[in-house]
């Protein structure tokens, strides 16, 4: 099943999940009762902006401004939202 991500959607971290910088890993991670996920590349930059207030469009716009030279960034951001939703890391507000 494909997940449709709209620019007007707003997301938050799923219940019982916590996002943080893990000094030992030198990376952003998502902690949840079953374990931990280490976020690679720009994934941490996307999740860092998921605050139950910003729309997907606002997150995309902010990341495009922050990383203007990143090719195909919008598609990668939407892909990150799709993956995070399919894994149960995010919930729609």
Could you describe each region identified by the protein language model?
Residues 35-93:
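Long, charge-rich, low-complexity alpha-helical segments
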Residues 1-48, 93:
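Acidic, low-complexity/disordered tracts enriched in E/D and polar residues
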């Amino acid at each position: 099943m494909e997940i449709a991500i709209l620019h007007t959607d707003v997301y938050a971290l799923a219940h019982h999940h916590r996002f943080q910088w893990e000094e030992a890993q030198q990376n952003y991670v998502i902690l949840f009762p079953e374990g931990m996920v280490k976020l690679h590349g720009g994934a941490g930059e996307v999740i860092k902006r998921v605050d139950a207030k910003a729309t997907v469009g606002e997150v995309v716009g902010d990341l495009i401004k922050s990383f203007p030279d990143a090719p195909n960034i919008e598609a990668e951001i939407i892909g990150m939202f799709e993956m995070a939703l399919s894994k149960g890391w995010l919930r729609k507000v």
